[in-house]
């Protein structure tokens, strides 16, 4: 242990920004699993492979890719437009259409044949990752890809990029703001939305970095939001270590060339904002 109380490892850690290395971990790519069932809200688009299985009195398997105009071709029936439909919607629609050539499919009370529509190979989408990432650009991704996977492909968030205000723009409108800390701290993946063709991910610069040192479990730098308090910072840092004096702490705030020093009592931790 060094004279200043830190080990060499702790000294290196306290200069790091918490969460920034999540996209640098080789074994954590956030790549979508090909073995999962198709999400119920997944919408078919050009390039998706549609598999139609029919069994019972009638038996057939039909496979086709959705064309650029959003259709598949079914022998003896012609073009069927599926673009924008979920698998459930496509299943219902195809049941009625295929009943024209396979009798008994659309008899809900006692169908003599059954139909099941599944997704084969999924399409590739183009997504733009812009702003404070190491490798901004346009990426070809699986249509199951999420924001986190796109950020991983772009090399992760840069040294001045925000982990907590990542914006997703679709059709010129901001549709989501992603906070990586919600995933790291709480395991929440609600904000890690599935991407669509033409989506833009924008990583702006961070607004505030706060360094916490001394007897806490994770002495590091943390990106803080405007409404977060000292209590939140302590929570991010894992709380006080066993030998810490917990009744008060000292905060140094830089204002231009001047430094302001505050002593904060424990009763004010939840109201004093960084």
PLM region spans:
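Ser/Thr/Pro/Gly-biased, low-complexity, turn-/loop-rich segments
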Residues: 1-274
